[in-house]
A protein has these predicted regions:
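Structured interaction patches on ligand/partner-binding surfaces of diverse proteins
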Residues: 128-129, 204-242, 317-356
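Bacterial N-terminal signal peptides that target proteins for export
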Residues: 2-15
Length: 365
Protein backbone atom coordinates (compact mmCIF):
# COMPACT_ATOMS: atom_id res chain seq x y z
CA UNK A 1 0.00 0.00 0.00
CA UNK A 2 2.82 2.35 0.92
CA UNK A 3 4.63 1.52 -2.35
CA UNK A 4 1.48 2.32 -4.36
CA UNK A 5 1.18 5.66 -2.57
CA UNK A 6 4.80 6.55 -3.37
CA UNK A 7 4.36 5.63 -7.05
CA UNK A 8 1.21 7.73 -7.25
CA UNK A 9 3.04 10.67 -5.66
CA UNK A 10 5.95 10.36 -8.12
CA UNK A 11 3.58 10.25 -11.08
CA UNK A 12 1.69 13.31 -9.83
CA UNK A 13 4.89 15.31 -9.40
CA UNK A 14 6.07 14.31 -12.89
CA UNK A 15 2.74 15.35 -14.37
CA UNK A 16 2.91 18.75 -12.67
CA UNK A 17 6.47 19.33 -13.95
CA UNK A 18 5.45 18.47 -17.52
CA UNK A 19 2.40 20.77 -17.36
CA UNK A 20 4.52 23.68 -16.11
CA UNK A 21 7.16 23.02 -18.77
CA UNK A 22 4.73 22.96 -21.68
CA UNK A 23 2.83 26.00 -20.39
CA UNK A 24 6.05 27.99 -20.32
CA UNK A 25 6.80 26.97 -23.91
CA UNK A 26 3.34 27.71 -25.23
CA UNK A 27 3.91 31.43 -25.82
CA UNK A 28 6.78 33.82 -26.52
CA UNK A 29 7.70 35.58 -23.29
CA UNK A 30 10.77 36.69 -21.38
CA UNK A 31 12.05 35.18 -18.14
CA UNK A 32 10.16 36.48 -15.11
CA UNK A 33 11.53 38.08 -11.95
CA UNK A 34 14.17 40.71 -11.28
CA UNK A 35 13.95 44.46 -10.80
CA UNK A 36 11.06 46.54 -12.11
CA UNK A 37 11.73 47.50 -15.74
CA UNK A 38 11.44 51.23 -16.47
CA UNK A 39 13.96 51.42 -19.35
CA UNK A 40 12.61 51.65 -22.94
CA UNK A 41 13.58 48.93 -25.42
CA UNK A 42 16.74 49.46 -27.44
CA UNK A 43 17.86 48.24 -30.85
CA UNK A 44 20.58 45.59 -30.67
CA UNK A 45 21.25 44.84 -34.32
CA UNK A 46 19.79 43.97 -37.69
CA UNK A 47 20.50 41.05 -39.96
CA UNK A 48 22.03 41.85 -42.40
CA UNK A 49 23.97 44.35 -40.26
CA UNK A 50 24.13 47.02 -43.00
CA UNK A 51 20.99 47.19 -45.12
CA UNK A 52 22.44 48.27 -48.47
CA UNK A 53 22.01 46.46 -51.80
CA UNK A 54 18.65 45.32 -50.47
CA UNK A 55 16.21 43.50 -52.74
CA UNK A 56 12.43 44.05 -52.78
CA UNK A 57 10.53 41.60 -50.51
CA UNK A 58 13.82 40.62 -48.82
CA UNK A 59 13.49 39.41 -45.23
CA UNK A 60 15.47 41.25 -42.55
CA UNK A 61 15.60 40.52 -38.83
CA UNK A 62 15.53 43.31 -36.24
CA UNK A 63 16.71 42.38 -32.76
CA UNK A 64 15.99 44.36 -29.58
CA UNK A 65 17.55 44.08 -26.13
CA UNK A 66 14.31 42.82 -24.55
CA UNK A 67 10.93 41.32 -25.32
CA UNK A 68 8.39 43.64 -26.95
CA UNK A 69 4.66 44.09 -26.47
CA UNK A 70 3.32 42.48 -29.64
CA UNK A 71 0.10 44.54 -29.62
CA UNK A 72 2.07 47.81 -29.79
CA UNK A 73 3.76 46.93 -33.10
CA UNK A 74 0.76 47.66 -35.31
CA UNK A 75 0.88 51.42 -34.72
CA UNK A 76 4.62 51.64 -34.17
CA UNK A 77 6.19 50.66 -37.52
CA UNK A 78 6.36 53.12 -40.42
CA UNK A 79 8.44 53.36 -43.58
CA UNK A 80 9.63 56.76 -44.85
CA UNK A 81 9.38 58.42 -47.26
CA UNK A 82 5.66 57.84 -46.94
CA UNK A 83 3.91 55.63 -49.45
CA UNK A 84 1.62 52.65 -49.99
CA UNK A 85 3.91 49.79 -48.96
CA UNK A 86 3.09 46.09 -48.82
CA UNK A 87 5.56 45.08 -46.11
CA UNK A 88 4.72 42.49 -43.46
CA UNK A 89 6.34 41.38 -40.23
CA UNK A 90 6.39 38.48 -37.77
CA UNK A 91 6.82 38.90 -34.02
CA UNK A 92 9.38 36.67 -32.26
CA UNK A 93 9.67 38.06 -28.74
CA UNK A 94 12.78 40.26 -28.81
CA UNK A 95 13.09 39.90 -32.59
CA UNK A 96 11.00 40.99 -35.56
CA UNK A 97 11.25 39.40 -38.99
CA UNK A 98 10.23 42.00 -41.56
CA UNK A 99 9.68 41.39 -45.28
CA UNK A 100 10.42 44.62 -47.16
CA UNK A 101 7.98 46.12 -49.69
CA UNK A 102 8.01 45.06 -53.33
CA UNK A 103 7.67 48.63 -54.65
CA UNK A 104 11.08 50.05 -53.70
CA UNK A 105 12.78 52.63 -55.92
CA UNK A 106 16.47 52.21 -56.71
CA UNK A 107 17.72 55.75 -56.14
CA UNK A 108 16.53 56.58 -52.62
CA UNK A 109 17.30 55.61 -49.03
CA UNK A 110 14.30 54.39 -47.06
CA UNK A 111 13.87 54.33 -43.31
CA UNK A 112 12.09 51.87 -41.05
CA UNK A 113 10.93 53.92 -38.07
CA UNK A 114 9.78 52.50 -34.75
CA UNK A 115 7.93 55.39 -33.15
CA UNK A 116 7.11 56.05 -29.50
CA UNK A 117 4.06 53.77 -29.65
CA UNK A 118 6.45 50.82 -29.36
CA UNK A 119 6.47 49.28 -25.87
CA UNK A 120 8.29 46.47 -24.17
CA UNK A 121 6.36 43.70 -22.44
CA UNK A 122 6.30 45.76 -19.23
CA UNK A 123 4.49 48.62 -21.00
CA UNK A 124 7.55 50.91 -21.13
CA UNK A 125 7.41 53.08 -24.27
CA UNK A 126 10.20 54.38 -26.44
CA UNK A 127 11.19 57.94 -25.58
CA UNK A 128 12.51 58.67 -29.07
CA UNK A 129 12.10 57.07 -32.48
CA UNK A 130 14.39 54.25 -33.60
CA UNK A 131 15.43 54.72 -37.24
CA UNK A 132 16.84 51.97 -39.46
CA UNK A 133 17.95 52.95 -43.00
CA UNK A 134 17.87 50.59 -45.97
CA UNK A 135 18.47 51.02 -49.68
CA UNK A 136 18.71 49.18 -52.96
CA UNK A 137 21.86 51.21 -53.62
CA UNK A 138 25.35 50.33 -52.39
CA UNK A 139 25.48 53.42 -50.14
CA UNK A 140 22.94 55.41 -48.14
CA UNK A 141 21.97 58.97 -49.00
CA UNK A 142 23.95 61.14 -46.60
CA UNK A 143 22.27 64.57 -46.63
CA UNK A 144 20.82 65.99 -43.42
CA UNK A 145 18.51 68.76 -42.22
CA UNK A 146 18.89 69.74 -38.58
CA UNK A 147 18.11 72.52 -36.16
CA UNK A 148 16.46 73.44 -32.88
CA UNK A 149 12.92 74.05 -31.66
CA UNK A 150 12.47 76.88 -29.19
CA UNK A 151 9.47 78.14 -27.25
CA UNK A 152 6.90 76.69 -24.89
CA UNK A 153 5.45 73.39 -26.13
CA UNK A 154 4.41 70.00 -24.80
CA UNK A 155 5.28 68.05 -27.94
CA UNK A 156 6.84 68.81 -31.31
CA UNK A 157 6.95 67.19 -34.74
CA UNK A 158 8.92 68.28 -37.81
CA UNK A 159 7.19 67.52 -41.12
CA UNK A 160 9.03 67.34 -44.42
CA UNK A 161 7.70 67.25 -47.98
CA UNK A 162 9.52 66.71 -51.27
CA UNK A 163 9.63 69.82 -53.50
CA UNK A 164 8.67 73.44 -52.84
CA UNK A 165 4.93 73.25 -52.18
CA UNK A 166 2.22 75.86 -51.82
CA UNK A 167 0.73 76.18 -48.35
CA UNK A 168 -2.67 74.81 -49.38
CA UNK A 169 -0.91 71.67 -50.65
CA UNK A 170 0.91 71.29 -47.32
CA UNK A 171 -2.44 71.46 -45.52
CA UNK A 172 -3.91 68.63 -47.58
CA UNK A 173 -0.99 66.37 -48.49
CA UNK A 174 0.60 63.95 -46.00
CA UNK A 175 4.29 64.68 -45.35
CA UNK A 176 6.96 62.45 -46.85
CA UNK A 177 8.89 62.38 -43.56
CA UNK A 178 7.79 62.86 -39.94
CA UNK A 179 10.20 63.30 -37.04
CA UNK A 180 9.06 63.20 -33.42
CA UNK A 181 11.17 65.83 -31.63
CA UNK A 182 9.21 65.77 -28.36
CA UNK A 183 12.03 64.34 -26.26
CA UNK A 184 14.51 67.04 -27.19
CA UNK A 185 14.68 70.64 -28.34
CA UNK A 186 16.90 69.63 -31.26
CA UNK A 187 16.11 67.49 -34.30
CA UNK A 188 17.94 65.92 -37.22
CA UNK A 189 16.75 64.24 -40.43
CA UNK A 190 19.35 61.80 -41.76
CA UNK A 191 19.66 59.81 -45.01
CA UNK A 192 17.94 62.43 -47.18
CA UNK A 193 18.32 62.61 -51.00
CA UNK A 194 19.59 65.63 -52.92
CA UNK A 195 16.17 67.18 -53.47
CA UNK A 196 14.15 70.31 -52.71
CA UNK A 197 11.98 70.25 -49.59
CA UNK A 198 9.20 72.09 -47.75
CA UNK A 199 9.25 72.00 -43.95
CA UNK A 200 6.87 72.74 -41.07
CA UNK A 201 7.01 72.38 -37.27
CA UNK A 202 3.79 71.48 -35.41
CA UNK A 203 2.93 70.75 -31.80
CA UNK A 204 0.58 67.89 -32.72
CA UNK A 205 0.62 65.57 -35.72
CA UNK A 206 -1.99 63.11 -36.96
CA UNK A 207 -4.08 62.27 -39.99
CA UNK A 208 -7.13 64.14 -38.64
CA UNK A 209 -5.38 67.17 -37.12
CA UNK A 210 -5.78 70.59 -38.70
CA UNK A 211 -2.37 72.26 -38.47
CA UNK A 212 -3.99 75.71 -38.36
CA UNK A 213 -5.80 74.96 -35.07
CA UNK A 214 -2.68 74.02 -33.10
CA UNK A 215 0.68 75.75 -32.58
CA UNK A 216 2.76 75.60 -35.77
CA UNK A 217 5.81 77.28 -37.24
CA UNK A 218 7.03 77.74 -40.78
CA UNK A 219 10.70 78.30 -41.48
CA UNK A 220 11.68 81.82 -42.52
CA UNK A 221 11.62 80.80 -46.17
CA UNK A 222 9.91 78.09 -48.18
CA UNK A 223 12.82 77.04 -50.35
CA UNK A 224 15.02 74.43 -48.75
CA UNK A 225 17.33 72.50 -51.04
CA UNK A 226 19.86 69.75 -50.40
CA UNK A 227 21.22 69.86 -53.94
CA UNK A 228 24.30 71.72 -52.67
CA UNK A 229 24.68 69.79 -49.42
CA UNK A 230 23.23 69.43 -45.94
CA UNK A 231 21.47 72.19 -43.98
CA UNK A 232 21.77 73.14 -40.33
CA UNK A 233 20.35 75.88 -38.08
CA UNK A 234 16.89 75.33 -39.57
CA UNK A 235 15.27 76.59 -36.39
CA UNK A 236 11.65 76.98 -35.29
CA UNK A 237 9.76 78.71 -32.51
CA UNK A 238 6.54 77.14 -31.22
CA UNK A 239 4.37 79.29 -28.99
CA UNK A 240 0.88 78.93 -27.62
CA UNK A 241 -2.22 79.95 -29.54
CA UNK A 242 -3.80 83.29 -28.59
CA UNK A 243 -6.54 81.75 -26.40
CA UNK A 244 -3.92 79.87 -24.36
CA UNK A 245 -1.78 83.01 -24.07
CA UNK A 246 -4.74 84.99 -22.73
CA UNK A 247 -5.34 82.41 -19.98
CA UNK A 248 -1.68 82.56 -18.96
CA UNK A 249 -1.76 86.36 -19.03
CA UNK A 250 -4.66 86.42 -16.54
CA UNK A 251 -2.76 84.13 -14.18
CA UNK A 252 0.35 86.29 -14.54
CA UNK A 253 -1.58 89.47 -13.74
CA UNK A 254 -2.99 87.87 -10.59
CA UNK A 255 0.55 87.04 -9.50
CA UNK A 256 1.86 90.54 -10.22
CA UNK A 257 -0.91 92.12 -8.13
CA UNK A 258 0.70 90.80 -4.98
CA UNK A 259 2.33 93.50 -2.85
CA UNK A 260 6.06 93.99 -2.25
CA UNK A 261 7.23 91.88 -5.20
CA UNK A 262 10.97 92.34 -5.77
CA UNK A 263 12.08 92.27 -9.38
CA UNK A 264 15.22 92.26 -11.53
CA UNK A 265 16.50 94.31 -14.47
CA UNK A 266 18.27 93.09 -17.60
CA UNK A 267 20.45 95.34 -19.78
CA UNK A 268 22.80 94.78 -22.69
CA UNK A 269 23.62 95.46 -26.30
CA UNK A 270 23.36 93.49 -29.52
CA UNK A 271 25.20 93.93 -32.79
CA UNK A 272 25.15 92.11 -36.06
CA UNK A 273 23.65 91.92 -39.50
CA UNK A 274 19.98 92.68 -38.89
CA UNK A 275 17.21 94.93 -40.12
CA UNK A 276 15.26 97.27 -37.82
CA UNK A 277 12.78 97.17 -36.17
CA UNK A 278 14.24 94.49 -33.94
CA UNK A 279 12.66 93.32 -30.70
CA UNK A 280 13.68 91.39 -27.62
CA UNK A 281 11.84 88.62 -25.72
CA UNK A 282 12.78 87.22 -22.31
CA UNK A 283 10.69 84.19 -21.45
CA UNK A 284 10.20 81.14 -19.27
CA UNK A 285 7.16 78.90 -18.78
CA UNK A 286 5.46 81.36 -16.42
CA UNK A 287 6.52 84.85 -17.50
CA UNK A 288 7.34 86.79 -20.64
CA UNK A 289 8.85 90.27 -21.10
CA UNK A 290 9.55 92.16 -24.31
CA UNK A 291 10.87 95.49 -25.55
CA UNK A 292 12.20 97.19 -28.65
CA UNK A 293 15.95 97.34 -29.21
CA UNK A 294 17.25 100.87 -29.79
CA UNK A 295 18.96 101.94 -33.00
CA UNK A 296 22.35 101.77 -31.26
CA UNK A 297 21.65 98.13 -30.25
CA UNK A 298 21.04 98.80 -26.55
CA UNK A 299 18.09 97.44 -24.58
CA UNK A 300 16.65 97.30 -21.07
CA UNK A 301 13.99 95.12 -19.47
CA UNK A 302 12.55 96.08 -16.07
CA UNK A 303 10.22 94.42 -13.56
CA UNK A 304 11.40 90.86 -14.16
CA UNK A 305 10.36 88.22 -11.64
CA UNK A 306 13.14 86.06 -10.27
CA UNK A 307 13.89 82.90 -12.24
CA UNK A 308 15.70 81.27 -15.15
CA UNK A 309 14.91 82.65 -18.63
CA UNK A 310 15.57 82.27 -22.34
CA UNK A 311 16.50 85.40 -24.30
CA UNK A 312 15.94 85.96 -28.01
CA UNK A 313 15.84 88.78 -30.53
CA UNK A 314 13.81 88.87 -33.73
CA UNK A 315 13.30 91.07 -36.76
CA UNK A 316 9.78 92.45 -36.37
CA UNK A 317 9.15 92.89 -40.09
CA UNK A 318 5.47 93.86 -39.74
CA UNK A 319 6.11 95.98 -36.62
CA UNK A 320 3.41 94.30 -34.51
CA UNK A 321 5.62 93.42 -31.50
CA UNK A 322 4.92 89.70 -32.02
CA UNK A 323 7.31 86.97 -33.14
CA UNK A 324 5.28 85.69 -36.09
CA UNK A 325 5.79 82.12 -37.25
CA UNK A 326 4.01 82.44 -40.57
CA UNK A 327 0.49 81.96 -41.84
CA UNK A 328 -1.39 79.47 -44.01
CA UNK A 329 -3.62 82.24 -45.39
CA UNK A 330 -0.91 84.68 -46.55
CA UNK A 331 2.53 84.51 -48.13
CA UNK A 332 4.12 85.30 -44.78
CA UNK A 333 6.75 82.93 -43.41
CA UNK A 334 8.46 83.00 -40.02
CA UNK A 335 10.32 86.10 -38.88
CA UNK A 336 14.05 85.68 -38.42
CA UNK A 337 15.06 85.16 -34.78
CA UNK A 338 18.18 84.39 -32.76
CA UNK A 339 18.39 82.78 -29.32
CA UNK A 340 21.03 83.71 -26.76
CA UNK A 341 23.27 80.65 -26.33
CA UNK A 342 22.97 80.45 -22.52
CA UNK A 343 20.00 80.55 -20.15
CA UNK A 344 19.89 83.59 -17.84
CA UNK A 345 19.31 83.38 -14.07
CA UNK A 346 17.80 86.59 -12.68
CA UNK A 347 17.60 87.39 -8.98
CA UNK A 348 15.34 89.87 -7.22
CA UNK A 349 16.78 93.38 -6.69
CA UNK A 350 19.64 92.64 -9.08
CA UNK A 351 20.57 94.24 -12.39
CA UNK A 352 22.14 91.83 -14.84
CA UNK A 353 24.18 93.24 -17.71
CA UNK A 354 25.04 90.59 -20.25
CA UNK A 355 28.10 90.88 -22.53
CA UNK A 356 27.70 92.42 -25.96
CA UNK A 357 25.86 89.90 -28.09
CA UNK A 358 27.20 89.73 -31.63
CA UNK A 359 25.64 87.58 -34.29
CA UNK A 360 25.86 87.45 -38.05
CA UNK A 361 23.45 86.03 -40.57
CA UNK A 362 25.07 83.52 -42.87
CA UNK A 363 24.30 83.46 -46.54
CA UNK A 364 20.99 81.72 -47.21
CA UNK A 365 21.25 78.33 -48.85
Amino acid sequence: MERMFLNLLRNSISLIIWVVFFASCASVSSPQGGDIDDIPPELNETSPKILTDIKPTQKITIEFNEYLDESSLKNAITIFPSGEYDFRYEYRGDKIDLWLPSNLEKDITYMIVFNTNLKDEHNVRLKKDIIIPFSRKAVFDSNTIQGNIFGDFNSAFILLWFNHLDKDVILNQPPDYVLNASSNSSYKFNFLPKKDFSILAVEQYGSNINYEEKPFSFYRKNQLSLKDGSLDNINFYLHKMKSEENEDSEEKNDTNDEKNIKTATLTGEVSGNFIHPISLILKNKKNEYSNMIQLDGSYILDGILEGKYQLLVYEDRNNNSVLDMGSFTTNQFAERFFVYPDSLSLRANWELEIPKWNYNIREDK
